Amino acid sequence: MKKIIVLALALTLALLFSCGKQDTESPYKDYLLFVGTDQGANTIMKLNVHTGSISPLCQDPLCRHTADSGCHFFGAVTGTIYQYGGKLYFQRRYQSAAGVVSYVIGYDPEDQSEKSLYEITGGGGMGFSLGYFWRSYEDENGDKISLRVDLAAEKLETLDENYQRPIGQYGKQYFYPIYNLGGQYGEYLTHGFALGDSDGNISKKYAEDKIIQLVCTDSIEDDIVLFYCPKQRDDGKYDLEDQTLWACDLKTGEEWLVNDNIGDVYFLRDGDIIYFANWIDDPPVVGFDLNDNKERYNRTGGKIWRQNIRTGETELFLETGHCLEATSIDMIDDRLLFAYTDTDYDDYTEIENKHVGIWYDYKETRGWVIINPADGSFIDVVNTADIYSRR
């Protein structure tokens, strides 16, 4: 449930940050950028999607990637890397003499310069999308504050409390959710979606008869957008782990069912074909979650499927043998990247006949399966710079 809630939050906050095709103006066209460790410090790493090699984005082989080293990429926060307009943006957090500080950083690879665009104090929801850094939070008086940083203009803007934030872009128009449900997940689920101008003036509404959890505005091709609809249980509540996938032609308004059992996994789209790692029946137990008091499962089974969104035809594409992270997929330079996390089950302990993983002690290996969809060939890359694995 935690994973799907994160996806739902992405709907209300911005695009789904970790999935989708790379910025067409990116100077790093052959690389997946991620936060990893080098010289014992967190920094931005690059994975060559053709060779599988991993190296620091910093070009100094002796750099320690610390605040006093002059490194442009020190203190990068996992999951915050964003490419826009040929530049690189990320959040930086590190310990200073005054305490923990956090900034929005813009890096220009052309002249190898960086600039701090915004200092983050406190928490709240935040992230990059549509050429902006967005943030919503409550101040010390309990008032709700919404703001955005225009990355190109390097300008901070405070938003009106009634401002309707777009969730994606389609040509010169913007996508907006339609919130009117209330109740269970009322702030996450929408009653259809709409297109309008940058000021929120709506010009056309879609799928108003459907309850929608996620509109995939980062995967529009040939005027077709895909969206997720959670199934309704017998008790009337919506099941965010049991969803259907629909398509909508933005020109004609025509809708059709693509997949009636997509679960809660994301996909990568290449024309009329989508790739995903779907749930399986009778999934193997990964371990026992002491916090939720229930078993945890590997529901992906290491299998990648592909489906034609128009005909519905589905076929098994590849068996990887890994525990695939079905919500962490990228497409870079015509390569599909499925992330995985494999656990060493020998490090689990039996407690009352339950497999219990010792947090920060049992061994995990993370990596990627990088696929060439043209011929089905792939390479398997272990993340040697992973900041989480215990190997």
What are these regions (language model features)?
Residues 1-4:
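Positively charged n-region of N-terminal signal peptides that target proteins for export
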Residues 11-12:
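Repetitive helical segments and hydrophobic/amphipathic motifs
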Residues 15-18:
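C-terminal motif of bacterial Sec signal peptides marking the signal peptidase cleavage site
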Residues 20-56:
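An edge-strand/N-cap motif at the start of beta-rich repeat modules
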Residues 22-25, 65-83, 120-131, 161-171, ...:
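Repeated scaffold domains used in trafficking and secretory/extracellular systems
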Residues 33-36, 89-92, 133-137, 175-177, ...:
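Residue position within the beta-strands of beta-propeller blades
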Residues 43-65, 99-119, 141-161, 184-208, ...:
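Surface-exposed loop/turn elements that mediate protein-protein interactions on large endomembrane-trafficking
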Residues 278-283, 292:
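Loop/turn-rich, solvent-exposed surfaces of beta-rich toroidal or solenoidal domains
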